[in-house]
Amino acid sequence: MPDLLIELRSEEIPARMQRKAAGDLKKLVTDALVEAGLTYEGAREYWTPRRLALDIRGLTARSADLREERKGPRIDANEKAIEGFLRAAGLSSLSEAHVHNDPKKGDFYVAHIVKPGREAEEIIADVMPAIIRDFPWPKSMRSGAASAKPGSLRWVRPLQSIVCTFGAEHDETKVIPFEVDGIVASNITYGHRFHAPEAITVRRFADYAEKLEKAKVVIDAERRKEIISADAHNVAFANGLELVEDEGLLEEVAGLVEWPRVLMGSFEESYLEIPSEIIRLTIKTNQKCFVTRKPGAETLSNRFILVSNIEAKDGGKEIAHGNGKVVRARLSDAAHFWKRDQSDLPDLETLTASAEKFGLDLKKPLDQRMAKLDALNVTFHAKLGTQGERVARIRSLAAALARLTGADAASVDRAVVLAKADLRTEAVGEFPELQGIMGHKYAVLQGEAAAVADAIEDHYKPQGPSDRVPTDPVSATVALADKLDTLVGFWAIDEKPTGSKDPYALRRAALGVIRLILEGSARLPLLPCFDVALAALKAQRPDIRAEISADLLAFFHDRLKVYLRDLGARYDLIDAVLAPDADDLLMIARRVEALTAFITAEEGRNLLTGTKRATQILAAEEKKGTEVAESVDEALFRLDAERTLHASIKVASDDARDAIVKEDFRSAMQALSKLRAPVDDFFNDVLVNDEDKAIRANRLALLGLIRSATGEVADFSKISG
């Protein structure tokens, strides 16, 4: 079967756009071909800084014929209706139509229409111009002489050539003829811009990839990453160093070069006095280079790894030297703002009011920055006030949380008032990724307690499912207060996540709260926390929306389900223990854990069967309006199975309740498991729907006791199986 090769070659595509663009090309082309009636065996996308490529294997050479039956008017219809039918069906006379009999409606004309399939080449030539013209670039531009015309092509960077070849493996390939804004599809591409700029004639993908490789272009981005990683490790090792891994930078650099050549540069050791985080970000952000260190060391070396797109005649010495000069200049700037952040601000007399508000010491640089942050009224959000107001809210909430977490109240308060101070430092102004990290470093330099300094850095954590969770009580308390203030605030102004949109990362904040509570084994009822946070917000914004707790708690329940499901818990078991007002996340998680262990054991499965039968019968009768006694009357028992079940429920309920009070959910489940035999005997020996209404109502009340007893632990009706 034929294969299809497409290449769209342009000026340099931004690295951050390449992977998605190649995926978009694959989806758009394959979707269009399938919609047109073609099928294929496989497709893979490729990309470099200057090209998007698509290799489609086993594409059918022609789409199948389509057969359609079009129903017409009755055979005794008027002439006008029949003429309209013939015209619509493309028939020249009634002799080409068929007559179908309908026993109820009589005889009808029917047209059997055959739409012949189309050649794949025709389909490809038809769909490709529209795909290219409507390509979903985040940003695009017009270029060249055609750009002055209305509707001219927009591409991320000027599009220079199109390759489109089609043919079976052992046959000569054909060029699919189409053009876009004067760019005509061909079988001609070009190699490396400097090393091999000559035209290359290609047939199919294997030939294309091989010829590009000879022309100093590695078409496979994953292979470029492997080359860069392996060579970088080898160069570092050869110099007695190890590479500091950075997957994001590796992805980016692989999108900057077509022919990766790894080199090593250096800078003066005096710059190593700057914090490693600043050095790493300076070199990464500005020069797209990797840093190195001595094997096993925490601190960096003065050597860095760069990736060139050129195979230089001097082995890359001049390139490495040039990069070193730029790195030194950048590090000189970094050293300057590192020192300035440790010096006094020039306008301390204007910061007195802010210092008094937060209990700050204006002799200390970080305190000065916090006072400056407040004095400048830096906006956090237009509807939620300034950063200073936010710190005041977090301070109030953190004080309440400290009483629940057992954290030292003074340390928590000090950490909160300094947590956002580094937002006014030059280091964070240059590298926003360092907020918290620089606050920690400056806090240590001015003599803050270790717990306070750690909390300043850790209060942003965890920032994702794999990020570290702070375990120190002070850090955890400040992190919880920060995230809960964010969530309550945005709920109060009704700016919640919708669909895939979550501009304020509120899902991540909720997951952070969940992980802090569960992984820190914290007993922290959420509803009172919401109330404290909301009260602090209303003190600043009296007109703020107040009724948010139920909706915000439901949001937490949804995120908790996702978190527990990722850990292997079943959704139905989570639902079974999750009451609408359940705000103790640790207790919910422990109940799910106990229920999972119980329900997967034989005794649990058997009890589930009996309990669900009881609740289903009771629910059905309640729906029909059947009378159910308010309480069980032992005098109405007629069989031993009733008496035994009633006594067993009382014992099991008491034991389960005692265990729940102690939060021993496994023991509560085991207590309920003793109902298995009495429930089985009851359903074997007793007819619930007795003819006597009083006996029936009493037996239904007994089923109600089963539902109530098991409901202390979970809603068994929600458990599948």
UniProtKB/Swiss-Prot annotation:
<dbReference type="InterPro" id="IPR006194">
    <property type="entry name" value="Gly-tRNA-synth_heterodimer"/>
</dbReference>
<comment type="subunit">
    <text>Tetramer of two alpha and two beta subunits.</text>
</comment>
<keyword id="KW-0436">Ligase</keyword>
<dbReference type="GO" id="GO:0006420">
    <property type="term" value="P:arginyl-tRNA aminoacylation"/>
</dbReference>
<keyword id="KW-0030">Aminoacyl-tRNA synthetase</keyword>
<dbReference type="InterPro" id="IPR015944">
    <property type="entry name" value="Gly-tRNA-synth_bsu"/>
</dbReference>
<dbReference type="GO" id="GO:0006426">
    <property type="term" value="P:glycyl-tRNA aminoacylation"/>
</dbReference>
<keyword id="KW-0963">Cytoplasm</keyword>
<dbReference type="InterPro" id="IPR008909">
    <property type="entry name" value="DALR_anticod-bd"/>
</dbReference>
<keyword id="KW-0547">Nucleotide-binding</keyword>
<dbReference type="GO" id="GO:0004814">
    <property type="term" value="F:arginine-tRNA ligase activity"/>
</dbReference>
<dbReference type="GO" id="GO:0004820">
    <property type="term" value="F:glycine-tRNA ligase activity"/>
</dbReference>
<keyword id="KW-0067">ATP-binding</keyword>
<keyword id="KW-0648">Protein biosynthesis</keyword>
<comment type="similarity">
    <text>Belongs to the class-II aminoacyl-tRNA synthetase family.</text>
</comment>
<protein>
    <recommendedName>
        <fullName>Glycine--tRNA ligase beta subunit</fullName>
        <ecNumber>6.1.1.14</ecNumber>
    </recommendedName>
</protein>
<dbReference type="GO" id="GO:0005829">
    <property type="term" value="C:cytosol"/>
</dbReference>
<dbReference type="Pfam" id="PF05746">
    <property type="entry name" value="DALR_1"/>
</dbReference>
<dbReference type="GO" id="GO:0005524">
    <property type="term" value="F:ATP binding"/>
</dbReference>
<dbReference type="Pfam" id="PF02092">
    <property type="entry name" value="tRNA_synt_2f"/>
</dbReference>
